[in-house]
Design a protein with these regions (language model features):
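Conserved NTP-binding catalytic cores of kinases and kinase-like/nucleotidyltransferase enzymes
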Residues: 1-84, 178, 192-199, 307-323
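An alpha-helical support segment within catalytic cores of ATP-dependent transferases
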Residues: 7, 12, 125-135, 139-180, ...
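Active-site acidic catalytic loop and adjacent metal/ATP-binding pocket
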Residues: 23, 30-37, 45, 75, ...
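ATP-binding pocket architecture of kinase catalytic cores
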Residues: 31-134, 142, 149, 153, ...
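Hydrophobic packing residues in well-ordered alpha-helices of helical domains and bundles
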Residues: 58, 106-113, 136, 157-164, ...
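Active-site activation/catalytic loop segments of kinase-like enzymes and analogous catalytic loops
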Residues: 142-150, 211-244, 257-274, 286-294
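Acidic, serine/threonine- and proline-rich low-complexity regulatory regions
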Residues: 244-254
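ATP/Mg2+ or Mg2+-diphosphate-binding catalytic cores
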Residues: 265-323
Length: 323
């Protein structure tokens, strides 16, 4: 992965001239990341090239998080016109690899992640754009736009939308909006402060929405098997800390189903449109989460649609079940 041509001049203007620029594994977007090393110090260079990417939402949310006591990377230098940002380096120790290597730490570290959400949700929302019904519907539609055609299914898209309207509209009435980071999972949580704290990444798409969403993102992780016992214990921990009642469990499953349907569409799009074939293999896990969520009585309209439109043999890795 070659650094952007403007990187050396940008780094020189930030006081990092002559530093080594090393690639860092990226995400599912057009953004790219590089570690900048200069002697004993390091930083992260974000390349968010326009017009595909805009670093301003990331910068705004990062500054809000920092002002409110959360660990977002410090912004060291920026050039918005070129989409370049120099950030504090949180290192390489992610929650994902830590708990995979040390299962005994899973409950404790997931507890830290849940407690962070409790604190985040106690604050007033730090973004204005709402996570409303239109956004939820647009996201859920990715399933019928990408997954279904990829596996050879012709489905009733109008009934799909109606089913989501039926389950989402009651949920979205009457809750206090909180900051929803939207990709709050084990690969975006960095161990900092000697492994006692968590640093936040990949929050540029934050919206003001339902508090259950990021808990779903953490506990129904598309990239990692979270044991069901851990999921239940962490939901109980969140409810105990916030006083959330039975309605929260309903919201958890509704938003879990919506998120997982969206992810199935996104992972298929990453394969079909963006040429990233590693994502379909993650879909069987996402299907397991989705089917578990659909079993909740509040999801009956959506569950009925899936039963009528997506047969069991078409639920899995789209590269495999398309044949």
């Amino acid at each position: 992965m070659t650094p952007p041509l403007a990187a050396p001049a940008f780094l020189a203007s930030a006081g990092w001239g002559g530093a080594d620029i090393l690639p860092v594994a990226g995400d599912a977007s057009f953004r790219r990341y590089f570690r900048v090393v200069d002697g004993g110090r390091s930083a992260i260079l974000m390349d968010a090239p326009p017009p595909h990417e805009d670093p301003r939402p990331f910068l705004a949310v990062a500054r809000w998080l920092t002002r409110n006591g959360f660990a977002a990377p410090a912004i060291l230098h920026e050039d918005l016109a070129q989409g370049l940002v120099l950030l504090e380096d949180f290192g390489d120790v992610r929650l994902r690899e830590t708990v995979d290597a040390e299962p005994a730490r899973e409950l404790g570290l997931y507890g830290v992640a849940v407690d962070l959400l409790v604190q985040l949700h106690d604050a007033e929302a730090g973004v204005d754009a709402p996570y409303d019904l239109a956004v939820y519907q647009r996201e859920a539609a990715l399933f019928v736009e990408w997954y279904c055609p990829a596996v050879g299914l012709e489905v009733d898209t109008a009934a799909y939308r109606d089913a989501w309207d039926a389950v989402l509209a009651p949920l979205l009435a009457g809750h206090r909006p909180v900051t929803v980071l939207r990709d709050y999972h084990a690969e975006n949580l960095m161990l900092i402060d000697g492994g006692e704290g968590l640093g936040l990444l990949d929050f540029q798409d934050a919206l003001a929405g339902h508090p259950a969403y990021d808990l779903v993102s953490l506990l129904q992780d598309a990239r990692r098997d979270v044991p069901e016992a851990t999921e239940l214990a962490m939901r109980d921990r969140y409810r105990a800390a916030t006083g959330a009642g039975e309605a929260f469990d309903m919201a958890y499953h509704v938003l879990g189903a919506q998120r997982n349907a969206k992810i199935l569409g996104i992972f298929t799009r990453l394969w079909k449109r963006d040429g990233k074939p590693r994502y379909p293999a993650l879909c069987p896990r996402v299907w397991r989460y989705l089917e578990r969520d659909l079993a909740h009585p509040a999801l009956k309209p959506v569950a009925d649609w899936f039963a009528a439109n997506v047969p069991p043999e078409k639920r899995g890795d789209p590269m495999q079940v398309a044949a």
